[in-house]
A protein has these predicted regions:
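Hydrophobic/aromatic residues within transmembrane alpha-helices
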Residues: 18, 28, 32, 78, ...
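Juxtamembrane helix-entry segments on the extracytoplasmic side of multipass membrane proteins
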Residues: 22-30, 52-58, 130-156, 193-213, ...
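Alpha-helical transmembrane segments of compact multi-pass small-molecule transporters, enriched
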Residues: 35-39, 90-104, 119, 183-187, ...
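Helix-helix packing/entry segments at the starts of transmembrane helices
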Residues: 30-31, 72, 87-93, 163-186, ...
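Glycine-/small-residue-enriched transmembrane alpha-helix faces in small-molecule transporters
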Residues: 1-27, 31, 138-166, 186, ...
Length: 293
C-alpha cells in the first residue's frame, strides 16, 4: 500500500503536465483503463487461472463503475482543472469518507476521537477548496470545480472499498483487476473514444508520451496490483490511510517541476487533514470495543 500511494503521488504532477501538453483528461482516463485491461489480461496468462462464478462477474462490473470509471474520471478531469498539490491533498480525505461509510454500511461505532478526526479533516478540505475559490485563475493554485471532482473521486473509491471488500478477498489481484478493467473499458470506450480522436498525436512530445506511459504502467497497472493485494488483507480504513504519502510526493514533485504554487493555506489544510485522519485511524473499531468489554 505504501508503494502504491507513492506511485500515485508521483502520478499527479506527471499526469497534470501531460494534460497541459495535448492530452485531454477523458483521453488520459481511457488510456489508463484500456492500458490497465491489456496489461492485466496479459499478466494473467502467467499466473494460475481462477474460476469466477457468473454472479461475481456481474459484481465486478458494478465494482468497476465505482472503483475505476467514477473514480478515475472524477480524479483525472479534476486534476486537469486544479493543481497537483490540491489533488494530492484531497486524496487524504478518503479515510474520513471510510469512517462515515463504515458507520452507515458496516455499523462501525463513531467514537469521540473519530468525530473530532472527521471534523478536523473536513475543516482542512473546506479550507483547501475555499482557497481555490478565492484564488481561481491564479496559475498553479487550482479551481473549485477541480477540487470538488477530486473529492468525488475519493467518495466513489471509498464506496468501492466498503461495498466490495468481501468480493475482493475471494480472488487474486490479477483476477480482480482483469475483470474490473475489462468491464471499465467496455463501458467507457463509447463515451471516451471521441476525446481520444481529438488528440493531435503528431504534435505530442516524447516527454508527454513518457508521462502517459508512467501513468498507465506505474500509476495504473503496478498501483492497482499493489493496492488490491493490500486490500485483500487490510480493512478499508487501513487501506485508505496510506493516502498520506500522496500529497507529500505530489507537493515535492509539483513544486520542483514548477507545476504548482505553494501557499500558507496549503500547509494549514495539510496539517488539519493529517491530524484528522490520524485520529480516525487511531480510534477503536467495532471489534476493538467488543473485545475490551
Amino acid at each position: 500500500m505504501l508503494g502504491a500511494a507513492t506511485f500515485w503521488g508521483l502520478m499527479a504532477p506527471l499526469g497534470k503536465d501531460a494534460m497541459n501538453n495535448g492530452i485531454n483528461g477523458v483521453a488520459l482516463v481511457m488510456f489508463r483503463i484500456l492500458g490497465g485491461a491489456t496489461l492485466f489480461w496479459l499478466a494473467s496468462l502467467f499466473v494460475q487461472k481462477e474460476n469466477v462464478c457468473r454472479k461475481d462477474i456481474f459484481l465486478f462490473m458494478l465494482a468497476a463503475i465505482l472503483g475505476l470509471i467514477c473514480n478515475q474520471c472524477c480524479y483525472t478531469i479534476g486534476l486537469s482543472l486544479t493543481s497537483p498539490i490540491n489533488a494530492g491533498i484531497i486524496t487524504t480525505t478518503m479515510p474520513i469518507f471510510a469512517l462515515i461509510l463504515s458507520a452507515l454500511i458496516l455499523k462501525e461505532p463513531i467514537t469521540p476521537k473519530k468525530a473530532i478526526g472527521v471534523a478536523l479533516g473536513f475543516s482542512g478540505a473546506v479550507l483547501l477548496i475555499s482557497t481555490s475559490l478565492r484564488m481561481a485563475g491564479v496559475n498553479g493554485v487550482g479551481s473549485i470545480k477541480g477540487d470538488l471532482l477530486c473529492l468525488g473521486a475519493q467518495l466513489s473509491y471509498t464506496l468501492y472499498l466498503t461495498i466490495f471488500n468481501k468480493l475482493v478477498k475471494r480472488y487474486s489481484a490479477f483476477t480482480i483487476n482483469k475483470w474490473m478493467f475489462l468491464w471499465a473499458t467496455l463501458l467507457l470506450f463509447p463515451f471516451a473514444f471521441p476525446s481520444v480522436q481529438a488528440i493531435s498525436f503528431s504534435q505530442i512530445s516524447l516527454k508527454t508520451y513518457l508521462e502517459v506511459g508512467y501513468v498507465v504502467v506505474f500509476g495504473t497497472f503496478i498501483c492497482y496490483l499493489l493496492m488490491i493485494s493490500g486490500q485483500r488483507v487490510l480493512r478499508p480504513t487501513v487501506v485508505s490511510m496510506y493516502n498520506y504519502m500522496q500529497p507529500v510526493v505530489a507537493t515535492i514533485v509539483s513544486v520542483s517541476l514548477g507545476l504548482a504554487a505553494l501557499t500558507f493555506n496549503h500547509f494549514i489544510a495539510v496539517v488539519l487533514i493529517f491530524i484528522g485522519v490520524w485520529l480516525v485511524v487511531r480510534s477503536k473499531s467495532k471489534r476493538d470495543i467488543s473485545s475490551s468489554r
